[in-house]
Structures are given as structure tokens and as C-alpha cells.
Amino acid sequence: MMLVEEAAPDAGALPVAALRGYLRLATGFEMATDAAEDAALAGFLRAAIATIEARTGKVLLRRPFRLRLEEWRDPARQPLPLAPVASVEAVEVTDAAGQVAAIEPAAWR
């Protein structure tokens, strides 16, 4: 099983201002300093979110993922490694010859 994050969370989705307020960080006299501080805070938030998501299996910020399986765990169902799942865009299977076939949504919903 390979789970790939296709896109990082939007920078606007990170609560940098809330973290800055919680930490009671003062604003500096130079805007460049504030921008560098905001970038550092965003990096700390991303690291914290990644740690929490890895330990809990819960996604905190919505973004697309791609799941690739070598085989189904159970023919009737396949548990997903992360939750909550907002939507499943497609289910495709690849045969031994490398041909990809899309499975109709009615067959997997």
C-alpha cells in the first residue's frame, strides 16, 4: 500500500495568525522579519500537523491523496488508511499486461 499526498494544504488554511496570537509573539519593526517569522511558524505548523496525522490516522486539513494497492485486503471492501474521507474521485485496476480499467462508481459505492 502506498499513500501519496498529491497537494500540500493551502497556505491560507494554516492558522499562522492564531498560533502567533497564542504564543503572544510581538510584531517587529521590519516587515521582512515578520514574513520570515510567519514562514517559520507555518513550517512548525506543517510539522506538527504531519506528526498528529501520522499518529492518529486522521486528516486535519483537507487535501487530495492517491492510494495505490498491490492487492485488495478483502474482496468485498478495502479500508482506507486515513479518515475522514470527503470523496473518492476514481477507482482503477491495472491488469497483468499493464492495462488500466476504471471501475464504475455503482460497483464500489
Where are these regions (language model features)?
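Divalent metal-cofactor coordination and adjacent catalytic microenvironments
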Residues: 1-109
